[in-house]
Amino acid sequence: MARSYANIFLKGGEAVEQEQKWIRAIQRHGSREAAEHLIGVYYDEIYRFVYRQTGSREDALDLTQSIFIAALRSLPGYRAVKASFRTWLYRIAANKVIDARRRARPVPVPWEEA
């Protein structure tokens, strides 16, 4: 995304209110524009989190994309009363990183006697 929304968090309550508007627009109408705004706010932050966990630029890019796809698909079930969007998104990110590590772990092959 060329546009950065990093400063949105400096506005306090207005930022949270705007974020909730975007979430409702996605939940109710599948708003692509709202999804782009929401991704724009969190993309760099989530990418850095994943990169620190994986140490790989390629893996971080792939996982970050996967995280946002999963988040957008799961957004109809998101409830702000249970957790902030940021907390919810980080839980998805952490789970995706754990899943990737499990898949990357070598599978032991039983030793056969000759």
Cite the ranges covered by each PLM segment.
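Sigma70-family region 2
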Residues: Q27-R28, R52-G55, F68-K82, R103-R105
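Arg/Lys-rich amphipathic alpha helix in sigma70-family domain 2
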Residues: P76-G77, R91-W111
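Structural recognition of an alpha-helix C-terminal capping motif at a helix-to-coil junction
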Residues: R48, D62-I69, A83-N95
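Hydrophobic side chains within well-formed alpha-helices
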Residues: E19-W22, A34-A35, L63, F85, ...
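N-terminal module of bacterial RNA polymerase sigma factors
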Residues: M1-E45
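Solvent-exposed, non-membrane alpha-helical residues enriched in polar/charged side chains
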Residues: I23-R24, E36, Y47, Y51, ...
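Alpha-helix N-cap/helix-initiation sites
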Residues: R32, E36, R57-L61, K82
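Amphipathic, Lys/Arg- and hydrophobic-enriched alpha-helical face
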Residues: I39-R57, S74
